Amino acid sequence: MEKVCFMITPIGKEGSDVRKNADEVLDYIVNPICKEYGYSVVRADKMANSGLITKAIIEQIITADLVIADLTGNNPNVFYELAIRHSYRKPTIQIVKGEIDIPFDVANMRTISYETTLSGADVAKREIEATLKSIEDGNSVHNPVSEVSTLLNISANSTEENAEVLSTLL
């Protein structure tokens, strides 16, 4: 069974700079490296589903084997979808065009910077590949939600002896 990578990204209107960037990232960075690792890439505007698009998007966010989230433009929909993905503790790769500041809540997570030039796309593909290898090797998923959730679970099952240590971590 083929693995699925869902692409969370600002899409923009047909013909817009936002759409052009989304298409270039998909075609020249994400698709080539994901195909190499056996993933089919799905993006919201390319989905053939009929009915509620939001339902189909959320289903992909939850069930996809991998999500690549493009934080370029600080799009609210992208961050909403990324937060949903975080709550499921599943593999996610964050990317952003250039050296753009990203919001505090996700800034401490590794974010791969990309450019849509030939050399920039090659650099981004190598970095995504390194992250994909780590995911394929079974390394655990870390994000702000999973970290706090783990600590809360430990805290709920802790003894009085280690409660003080846990309180400093929370």
Question: Where is each model-derived feature located?
Answer:
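C-terminal interaction surface of TIR/SEFIR-family domains
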Residues: T111-L170
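Conserved N-terminal substructure of TIR/SEFIR domains
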Residues: M1-M47
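TIR-domain catalytic/interaction hotspot
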Residues: N31, V42-A69, G73-E81
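Flexible, glycine-rich phosphate/dinucleotide-binding loops
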Residues: E14, S50, D101
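Flexible, glycine- and charge-enriched loops at secondary-structure boundaries
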Residues: R19-D23, T54, A121
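Cross-kingdom TIR/SEFIR domain
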Residues: G73-S134
